[in-house]
């Protein structure tokens, strides 16, 4: 504690200024500058000082505010019922103190509904006569931002309820670990800055002025609060069950628990499970289950008295940087990676951490031999948070960023205002290798047996220089590869030959054009039907397709204007590679799945999720990630959870994996 009032005043001023700056970066710019636990420690210190020196309390203090200011670029929304923040604690002892306060106020023990604390962005959904009227962020708690146009592109948000009710529900908008990793990879390869964690990726994606951007970002929601629920709903647990029946996406891991011992067991359970969940959680939330008791307990100016968040302690380890490796991606972006002494962190052994670009490397001032603090950003990505300067070797020297490509030796450049460092040599062996590996990948041409090691050998032995060369390989060529015998040779040649029959969207995606992902390739192929028309399409024609923006359109037109691209397409066509769209007009003739919206859930025994999705899409189905009234069919495997229950509640047709395969085989038999 500060020794005098004057010292306390000075520390409070410093803390408020620092916390205001950090909160602005976190809530308003979606670009955090410190880890959550650092913010929490400073915030707790400010609370401690304000409690000790009542004369230092101020209505302007961040401890008396909710969230951040409202983004002036988005329409403002006034919340009829304020969207409050939550108090938080960091130990089981503090949870016990919360429970004692509740019992003292109520006069007897209470049951709690315990929920996972999803690391996302607070969201309000208002319905009028059963139709979505407005969606808004929390903002400062009193006034939020109108994000209705963007929320319409979040698949698990119902646009219409099965009952014509006027109501409001609230929850969390989040980005799954898979979607986050994919988004950051795409941004990294494009030379764009990456998001620090899934929470900020979700916030930045939801608060877009262009809804098309939101649509591409694969956001999800968990709904957990019903404002003024209908008569007969008496508890938080019951409210969540009833909201699920209305079609809202709720979290299946919530439980009604009668005592703190069970709550502690729940915390221990999900402390162990958190790494295996498909989304990020940063704690658990304890809520008095009885809604009448919630009303009796009421709120402070900032937080409800009937709920509290228990936040997981940060996992951070120290290790030593031994090397900084530079790798070249298929688009030419050169990325530094710190190679470190292996250390156990958040459920896995970590020995490498991306430094992303030269700017970050310089900002952190990482040097060989440095001891660094390592954590997992969003519980997913190993990341260096800082250098432990007190342990820096005396003979340490600043790290020099290379000026030559580590693969081909050509000069490295910065394009326009990119932070990324690039090799722009189209013949760079590393780029060629990455490009061919991508072309052969399961998501693209799906050439079984043609992985990175085989591609590396093919290039090293001068057998291929681009993707078209694959279709001119012979058995004699492949016999030159190490450990490649007759069976392996025949299998690879068959796989290459089969890939000639793929639909053109897989070829387009396989070319690895900047910013053109699998979904974009499919939309473009569906519109133009063949590669010739795609290659000659104008920017205006491309952007007329829903969700295709200027970035994708310009990348495509620039690529197809290159002479090398024209020659490559000609050689692919000469090799018999299909250049036509085989979707709705071809393979997807009449069949059970054609035109249906299908959801997959549970563990599939015969195919990976991606393989099954491709099969259904080839039959003309639309595969989505969440169950709603618009879902035509649910295909489920083992351990199917909330999606199956929701489909049953909505009376949506359901097929086991075996039944779905039987339907697919019926289609194959008809061919």
Swiss-Prot record:
One of its GO terms (cellular component) is cytosol. Residues 588-671 form the BRCT domain. The keyword Zinc applies. NAD(+) binds at residues 36-40, 85-86, 115, 138, 172, 287, 311. Transmembrane segments: none annotated. Keywords: DNA damage, DNA repair, DNA replication, Ligase, Magnesium, Manganese, Metal-binding, NAD, Zinc. InterPro entries: BRCT_dom (IPR001357), BRCT_dom_sf (IPR036420), DisA/LigA_HHH (IPR041663), DNA_ligase (IPR001679), DNA_ligase_AS (IPR018239), DNA_ligase_CS (IPR033136), DNAligase_adenylation (IPR013839), DNAligase_N (IPR013840). GO terms for molecular function: DNA binding; DNA ligase (NAD+) activity; metal ion binding. Pfam families: BRCT, DNA_ligase_aden, DNA_ligase_OB, DNA_ligase_ZBD, HHH_2. The active site is at 117 (n6-amp-lysine intermediate). GO terms for biological process: DNA repair; DNA replication. PROSITE patterns: BRCT, DNA_LIGASE_N1, DNA_LIGASE_N2. It catalyses: NAD(+) + (deoxyribonucleotide)n-3'-hydroxyl + 5'-phospho-(deoxyribonucleotide)m = (deoxyribonucleotide)n+m + AMP + beta-nicotinamide D-nucleotide. The keyword Zinc applies. Its EC number is 6.5.1.2. Its cofactor is Mg(2+); Mn(2+). It comes from the Bacteria. Zn(2+) binds at residues 405, 408, 423, 428. DNA ligase that catalyzes the formation of phosphodiester linkages between 5'-phosphoryl and 3'-hydroxyl groups in double-stranded DNA using NAD as a coenzyme and as the energy source for the reaction. It is essential for DNA replication and repair of damaged DNA. Belongs to the NAD-dependent DNA ligase family. LigA subfamily. PANTHER family: CHROMOSOME TRANSMISSION FIDELITY FACTOR 18, DNA LIGASE. This is DNA ligase. It comes from Lactobacillus delbrueckii subsp. bulgaricus (strain ATCC BAA-365 / Lb-18). The lineage of its organism: Bacteria, Bacillati, Bacillota, Bacilli, Lactobacillales.
């Amino acid at each position: 504690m500060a020794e005098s009032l004057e010292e306390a005043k000075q520390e409070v001023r410093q803390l408020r200024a620092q916390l205001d700056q950090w909160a602005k970066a976190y809530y308003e710019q979606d670009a955090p500058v410190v880890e959550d636990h650092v913010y929490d420690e400073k915030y707790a210190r400010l609370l401690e000082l304000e409690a000790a020196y009542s004369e230092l309390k101020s209505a302007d203090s961040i401890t008396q505010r909710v969230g951040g200011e409202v983004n002036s670029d988005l329409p403002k929304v006034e919340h009829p019922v304020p969207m409050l923040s939550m108090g938080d604690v960091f130990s089981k002892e503090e949870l016990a103190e919360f429970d004692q306060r509740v019992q003292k106020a109520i006069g007897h023990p209470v049951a709690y509904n315990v929920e996972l604390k999803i690391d996302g962005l607070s969201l309000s959904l208002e319905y009028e006569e059963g139709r979505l009227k407005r969606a808004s962020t929390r903002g400062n708690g009193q006034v939020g931002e109108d994000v209705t146009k963007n929320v319409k592109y979040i698949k698990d948000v119902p646009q219409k309820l099965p009952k014509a009710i006027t109501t409001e529900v609230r929850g969390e908008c989040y980005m799954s670990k898979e979607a986050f990793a994919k988004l950051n990879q795409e941004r990294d390869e494009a030379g764009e800055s990456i998001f620090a964690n899934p929470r900020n990726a979700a916030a930045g994606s939801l608060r877009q002025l262009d809804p098309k951007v939101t649509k591409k970002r694969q956001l999800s929601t968990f709904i957990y609060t019903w404002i003024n629920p209908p008569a007969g709903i008496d508890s938080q647990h019951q409210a969540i069950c009833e909201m699920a029946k209305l079609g809202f996406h709720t979290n299946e891991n919530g439980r009604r628990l009668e005592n703190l011992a069970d709550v502690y067991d729940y915390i221990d359970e999900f402390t162990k499970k958190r790494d295996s969940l498909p989304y990020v959680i940063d704690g658990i939330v304890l809520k008095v289950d009885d809604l009448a008791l919630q009303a009796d307990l009421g709120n402070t100016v900032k937080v409800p008295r009937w709920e509290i968040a228990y936040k997981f302690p940060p996992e951070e380890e120290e290790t030593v940087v031994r090397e900084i490796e530079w790798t070249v991606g298929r688009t030419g972006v050169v990325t530094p990676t710190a190679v470190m002494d292996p250390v156990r962190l958040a459920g896995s052994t970590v020995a490498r951490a991306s430094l992303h670009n030269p700017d970050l490397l310089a900002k952190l001032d990482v040097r060989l031999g440095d001891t660094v603090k390592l954590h997992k950003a969003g519980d997913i990505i190993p990341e260096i948070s800082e250098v432990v300067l007190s342990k820096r070797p005396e003979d340490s020297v600043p790290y020099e960023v290379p000026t030559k490509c580590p693969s081909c030796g050509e000069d490295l450049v910065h394009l326009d205002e990119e932070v990324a460092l690039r090799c722009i040599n189209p013949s760079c062996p590393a780029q060629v290798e990455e490009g061919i590996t991508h072309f052969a990948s399961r998501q693209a041409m799906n050439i079984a047996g043609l992985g990175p090691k085989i591609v590396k050998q093919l290039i090293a032995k001068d057998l291929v220089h681009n993707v078209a060369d694959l279709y001119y390989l012979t058995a004699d060529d492949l016999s030159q590869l190490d450990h490649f015998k007759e069976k392996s040779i025949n299998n690879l040649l068959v796989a290459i030959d089969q890939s000639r029959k793929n639909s053109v969207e897989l070829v387009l995606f396989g070319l690895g054009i900047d910013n053109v992902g699998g979904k974009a390739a499919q939309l473009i192929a569906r519109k133009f039907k063949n590669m010739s028309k795609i290659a000659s399409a104008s920017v205006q024609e491309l952007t007329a397709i829903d969700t295709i923006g200027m970035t994708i359109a310009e990348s495509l037109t620039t690529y197809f204007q290159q002479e090398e691209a024209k020659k490559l397409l000609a050689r692919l066509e000469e090799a018999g590679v299909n250049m036509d769209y085989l979707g709705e007009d071809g393979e997807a003739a009449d069949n059970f799945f054609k035109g249906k919206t299908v959801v997959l859930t549970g563990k599939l025994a015969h195919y990976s999720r991606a393989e099954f999705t491709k099969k259904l899409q080839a039959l003309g189905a639309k595969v989505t990630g969440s169950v709603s009234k618009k879902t035509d069919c649910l295909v489920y495997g083992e351990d199917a959870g909330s999606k199956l229950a929701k489909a049953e509640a909505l009376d949506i047709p359901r097929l086991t994996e075996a039944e779905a395969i039987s339907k697919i085989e019926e289609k194959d038999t008809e061919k």
